[in-house]
Amino acid sequence: FLMTTLASRDLRGIAFWLMGDLSTAPPPGLLWILVVCFAVAAGSIFTTASDLNLLLAGEREAMHLGVDVTRVKLVVYVSASVLTGLAVSVSGAIGYVGLLVPHVMRMLFGSDYRVLIPTSAIGGAIAVVLADTLARTIIAPTELPVGAMTAMAGAPVFIYLLRRGQS
């Protein structure tokens, strides 16, 4: 329905948002709300890193070591959902970044969540900036959606990780 009723420039904007687009910034009045929500959610996840390390041994073992497993799960699920919602509301859906970057960081830096969480966040930001730069320059002056670039790079890496895990 939308494709038949919207003007072509509106349709292009929707298509780019659906595939990821970093060409527009959030309105200034909304920016501080995004920053505060990001700081609270990211801070909440960072505070659970040690408990997440204990959860690697299993829920029962972590509970015996004093971890409130239900609380940690709730904090991580809610915080991750808020962070995902913030990112998608600003840039649209950019696939493969949240799936692949943490796996690559785990291969590079190990499984300690005190290291893995910040390196995954920084690695994801770097991956998105690189993908956006490629999307803007690869067929300049036309711009590709960022999600198209991450999919072209992410799909082969994902297949490699799947095959590596099976062997």
Predicted feature residues:
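Alpha-helical transmembrane segments in inner-membrane proteins
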Residues: F1-S167
